[in-house]
Structure formats: structure tokens, C-alpha cells
Amino acid sequence: TQMGYEAYKLDDFGNDIEFPILFWVSEHSILVSISMGEDQHPEYLKTLCQSLSAWRPRQAANGLLLITDVSSLLENNEQITQQADELKSTIKTFNQAFGVSLPIYNVISNMGSISDFCQFFSAFDESKRDEVFGATAPYSKHGGIDADWFNDEYDHLISELIANMSNALAGQLNQDYRNSIASAPFQFGLLKQNLWLFLNRLYRGEQLSDALQFRGFYFTHDGQSSAQSDLLASTVSYSFGHE
């Protein structure tokens, strides 16, 4: 069970098995989790689309939560654009199968792998940490993502971190954590360029068709520890001529 959702009939097969498609059920909705790994297969997606369309003929799905691990945004530009193109192709498959342009909400996950970011929130209570950190875009008839909107919203998130820095520092006595709190807005700011590269590629329009329907970007972390990337140290090192 996660966030009120329970994996449907998972125990019939064993909890240690990773499935390319999983159904998560709650009292108010159903989430379909679709792996983009090597275990996925076009025939699985085709069967899923057919089944959902038969079950809900008028509207097979309400939208897409596109989960992207932040580590994939730290790759080189070519790999980032390739990932965006592959995702775009898969999403188009769903849009064509369902006959709609599904609204897409981008969730950047595993933010704890960015140095200092999660430490910023260490002294806040649970309700504060549970607040949404991201931005929801206004509806656009022809889809796509507006560069000015993205810049304004991302800069606003950086400003929020800076504005809350005093409160974060006041609640944290550990010096290492205090150093991380001071660095967090800079670490977060250094992610902006690569995130824009990814989103702009994913949501750019084409000559004869509308762009995908972008509706927002959000940041989250599942609490699990992982290797960290220090974007600030890498930038400083690069500025001194070190690769």
C-alpha cells in the first residue's frame, strides 16, 4: 500500500516480482503504473489500451503522471533529448489509442540524489514537507510549454527556498545540515537548464500536429537514500577547467 493505493492482486504473484504494468486501487481512483524499462513490450501496451478503452469507452484515462528520475536529467544533452523523444513516442501511442490529448503532469522523483536538497526540509514538520513543490500550468488548447512561464515558475520556486531559508536554519542545529540548507537553492537552480531541455524537447509542437498537453512539473522524494550528485561542486570545478 502506498499513499492510500493498494496494488491489485499483487500478493497472488509474490511481492518480489517487478511487473511492467501494475494497477493501484484506492477508494476514489485507479492508477495504472507502466514501466518504461526493458521488461516493457509494445504488445503489453496495445492490450492495455484496448482493455481500458473497452472498460471506459468515453474516456479511457483522465491523464498521465510522468515520473522521471532526476538522475536521468544529469546525463549529457544527447541522452536527455533521446529520452524525451522515446517518451513522446510512447505518449502519442496512448493519445492515438484513446482519441484524446491526455493532460501530462511531470513528476521529478528521487530529488534526494541532488546534494543538499532534502536537507533543506529537514527541520520542517510533516505537513510542511507534504506540501506540493512545483507548478501547475494553465490549459493550452494546442499543448506545449511556454518558455516564459517555465522561467517564471522555476525562479519562483528558487525564491521560495530562499525566503524560507531563515526558518529552515532556525530549526536545524546540525552544522552540516545548516551548510546544506544554505546551498540548496543553488543546487536546485543548477537543475533548471537540463529540466528545460527535457521538457522543451518533450512538448515541442510539430508542423502538422499539436504538441503534447503539458500541465505541470513537480518535485518529490520517496525517502530512500541513494548516491548524491553535487551540482554546485561540479559547476565550480568545471569553471576552474576541470572536467
Map each language-model feature to its residues:
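Basic, amphipathic N-terminal segments
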Residues: 1-243
